[in-house]
Amino acid sequence: MKNIGRIVLPIIILLLTVRINAVPAKAFDMIVRNLPNSEQLPTKELLCIFQDSEGYMWYGTEGGGLCRDDGYTVKVFRSDFKNPGVLENNSVTCITEDGEGKIWFGTKRGAYILSKTDYEIRALADETIKSWTITTMTATSDGMIWISTNRHLFRYNESGERTGKYILKWKGQENTVNSIYEDKKQTVWVTQAKGGLFCYD
């Protein structure tokens, strides 16, 4: 009986391999188009793209600031000689929107909140992250905004007050957070660059 198992199992594996390899590869048509208003962007180097609840497209650029595209024109939010001190750093790394419709965005030196009613930008008041690169951020259905830096994870309410700080370690070592995701059950999942998956419920 043991000999039959030794013979049958390799045959099944062989047949499955042949069957999988016999499936013809399908070609997919991919259409690549330029952004309609790309000539209005301050730079061609985009670090992130986000569509808000009103349908506006937001672009985070490398050195060019935050850009809002309404389909006709691009409005740019950045520090320059006309508007000094708007942002500590003009490289926008990530963008999200909270439940009140405010745009949150991270840069290579801190995080900011933009009000869409008057387009006023204010820096997140948390001194801890003002000089750090923000790697990713996500707004969750409970009104919280999760923000990661290179090795730390922070949670804020929609007013910008910090409600949690987490140091994530995988196999005893701190690691860079590379994504934050909320599933349908409102569980927050966090992945790390060199391995590690964490959940908060």
Give residue ranges: language-model regions.
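Carboxylate-rich, polar loop motifs that coordinate divalent cations or form catalytic acidic clusters
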Residues: M1-D201
